[in-house]
């Protein structure tokens, strides 16, 4: 079973996306912010994909990606953004930081799962 970490400051989004993923057969690990995600990753969690919000209180998603990419165990783990932003400049910034893709909220279950299938093999 593939494990996906979800990072979002919205409990509603975390619940909604984790339900979609569970129904599709994925295990999920949830974090309410970037700092919590980094703490969990520090425990050596086996991870196949990280999905993060871009705009969160404290450390934002771009800074989270930069920190994750410094961790040897997660250097090549795919990372997707799930965010309300759709500006091309932000997408380029995310790609430069190491993001593998982008999902614009609100997204349907179909959009989420198809995007995941493109980056998780």
Residues covered by each model-derived region:
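Charged docking surfaces used in two-component/phosphorelay signaling
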Residues: 15-23
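Acidic, metal-coordinating helix/loop segments flanking the phosphotransfer/catalytic sites
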Residues: 30-49
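Acidic catalytic/metal-coordinating carboxylates
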Residues: 32-36, 60-66
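His-Asp phosphorelay/catalytic-motif detector in bacterial-type signaling
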Residues: 46-48, 73-78
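Active-site residues of response regulator receiver
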Residues: 53, 83
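Receiver (REC) domain active-site loop signature in two-component systems and cognate sites
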Residues: 56
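Alpha4 helix (beta4-alpha4-beta5 surface) of REC/receiver domains from two-component response regulators
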Residues: 63, 86-101, 110-114
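A Lys-centered signature of the CheY-like receiver
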Residues: 105
């Amino acid at each position: 079973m593939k494990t996906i970490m979800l990072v979002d400051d919205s409990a509603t989004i975390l619940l909604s996306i984790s339900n979609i993923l569970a129904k599709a057969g994925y295990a999920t690990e949830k974090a309410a912010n970037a700092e919590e995600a980094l703490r969990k990753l520090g425990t050596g969690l086996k991870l196949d994909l990280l999905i993060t919000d871009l705009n969160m209180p404290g450390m934002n998603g771009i800074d989270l990606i930069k920190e994750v990419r410094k961790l040897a165990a997660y250097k090549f783990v795919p990372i997707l953004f799930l965010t309300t932003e759709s500006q091309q400049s932000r997408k380029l910034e995310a790609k430069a930081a190491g993001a593998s893709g982008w999902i614009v909220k609100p997204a349907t279950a179909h959009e989420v799962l198809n995007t995941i299938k493109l980056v998780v093999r």
